[in-house]
């Protein structure tokens, strides 16, 4: 994406214009003020987690205002005719979708992901929990693909099917897999977003299903995704389940699912936060369209 082509010193300079003081910018990034001059001397020393924080702030302050334009329309990115029943084409695509949704949330390397999927054995430097997350994600998305695309069956979006999807994703990871959370959940990377109270989750999810189950355009699916993540019905795995629902709803509508991964991760978080805090979805809709277009080129 556009922000990936800009070097980090330039991003820091532009962000400093926004924050005014280096101490304020350092606090927003999550580092000490001394880190900023150190980075100017050695930009390569910026750790990946802080590169992500810088990218997210850059997207938030510069790209989001640029993308927040009503009245934009996009041609639907349809599922190519060459995809169904062509394993040589759709399997690499599924692997990219699966790794992407894991990469957004964890630091798992592509090598470890491939080893977990291909060998179905635990890599030496990977916890059993992360191993299950990788394997469950890939095979759950593969099941969705085979059900909707190969068998021509619609994935009926309901509370029960969403819970079943969560059980598949989180089996071997959490004891409460497949059940709504009974605790307050916090979204660590999104500011100003409050999740639904535990006692209100069933009612809010019932409302989500009523309003969003039949979403069939990329704009509707993007808005439904932000709404689902704001509810945050499960104790963990909400992002992966939310993106799996995006995939299912896109395939139901014969649309190509958007590809979210490390390349557009910062814009994904910035656009999601903007949609949930301000109720404005134009940047998120554009991101969905650009990510689906990129998936087609992949």
Residue ranges of model-derived segments:
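FIC/Doc superfamily catalytic core
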Residues: 1-236, 240-298
């Amino acid at each position: 994406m556009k922000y990936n082509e800009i070097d980090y010193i330039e991003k820091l300079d532009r962000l400093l214009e926004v924050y005014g003081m280096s101490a304020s910018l350092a606090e927003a990034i999550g580092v000490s003020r001394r880190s900023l001059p150190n980075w100017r001397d050695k930009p390569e020393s910026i750790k990946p987690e802080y590169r992500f924080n810088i990218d997210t702030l850059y997207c938030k302050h510069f790209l989001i205002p640029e993308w927040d334009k009503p009245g934009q329309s996009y041609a639907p990115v349809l599922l190519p005719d060459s995809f169904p029943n062509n394993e040589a084409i759709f399997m690499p695509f599924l692997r990219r979708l699966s790794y992407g949704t894991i990469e957004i949330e964890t630091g798992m390397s592509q090598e470890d992901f491939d080893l977990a999927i291909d060998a179905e054995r635990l890599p030496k430097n990977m916890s059993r929990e992360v191993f299950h997350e990788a394997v469950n994600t890939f095979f759950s998305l593969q099941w969705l693909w085979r059900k909707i695309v190969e068998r021509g069956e619609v994935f009926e979006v309901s509370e029960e099917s969403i819970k079943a999807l969560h059980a598949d994703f989180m089996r071997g990871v959490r004891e409460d897999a497949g059940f709504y959370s009974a605790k307050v959940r916090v979204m660590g990377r999104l500011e100003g977003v409050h999740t639904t109270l535990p006692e209100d989750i069933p009612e809010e999810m019932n409302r989500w299903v009523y309003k969003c189950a039949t979403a069939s355009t990329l704009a509707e699916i993007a808005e439904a995704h932000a709404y689902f993540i704001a509810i945050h019905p499960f104790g963990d795995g909400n992002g992966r389940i939310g993106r799996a629902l995006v995939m299912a709803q896109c395939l139901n509508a014969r649309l190509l699912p958007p590809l979210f991964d490390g390349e557009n991760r910062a814009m994904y978080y910035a656009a999601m936060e903007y949609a949930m805090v301000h109720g404005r979805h134009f940047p998120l809709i554009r991101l969905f369209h650009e990510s689906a277009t990129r998936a087609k080129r992949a």
